[in-house]
Amino acid sequence: VTTPTNGAVRATGRRRTRAALAIGALVAVAGASAVTVALLGAGIAARGTGELHIPAPGTTTVLRAAVFTALALHLGELAGARLTGTGPTPRSWALWTALGGAAAAAGQIVLLAEVSDLDLTATYGTRDGGLLLAMANGFALAAGCVALRRPGWATGPLALVIGAEAMRAHPEPYTPEWGTALTVVHLTAASLWVGGLLYALRTTRLRGGAAREVLVRYARLAGWLYVALAATGTCSTLRRLPADVVFSTAYGRVLIAKLALVAVASALALAARRRLRRGGDATRPARAEVAALAGVVLVSAVLTVVPDPHWLSLRSALLR
């Protein structure tokens, strides 16, 4: 039996310290970049477009990103608990994500009241205020289900949240019911993709030799989710973004950034699936996929804040 020398132990310790510092620096840079995108993304995208100014775009982006994150984590945990089968499971985040989602929705109500110069009671009576109130109540009910140790019951309140957000995102007079239906499917599939993958990765850390089976089960669902996302995303884009203003509107520019991140996440997902088929370890590309999907969630929040591109297309047509 050989024992490591003091020099070997010190060298190992230095390597671990350097790795920890590198990871910490990477996390700090990613966090700073996320804050910058959230606070300044909508303004940068709208620069030079001549579009109407959106009040408090940075704060709105942060709050909507928090809502999307809460949905993804909670739905992903509900689906992941069924997918991963028997065995050790990670600690539940459902209660805190539901409470965070409720706080983010309530924060949007307060922000809407402030920018509209209305009191809270009057804000509740507006279309957006009423839908945000429904979202806050949905998250609160989901938190109550978790607190009562009935986590599966949270599916109903979370469905209310998704429906309210889909209706809020489509106030346009032209076929809003189609836009709402597309967003319901798109938001549900996106939440399950992001949250389900994160939950699967958290579970793999506890399963040891059975970790690969967890990712295999998730991959089966992810394929169908990707098809749903591609179909609904394409239809929504064709409905909402006129071809003549793809590069001249904030919506078009942000959408291009989102598609680039989705392409990165898709490539990483394919790499992970290829490793699974060969019997290898897919953890590393799956972790990178989660990071790319976090960027997608953030850019999606920016996309909900920028102006509807139709008016600029119409104005251009009238000026010709």
PLM region spans:
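Polytopic transmembrane helical bundles with strong interfacial aromatic enrichment
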Residues: 1-320
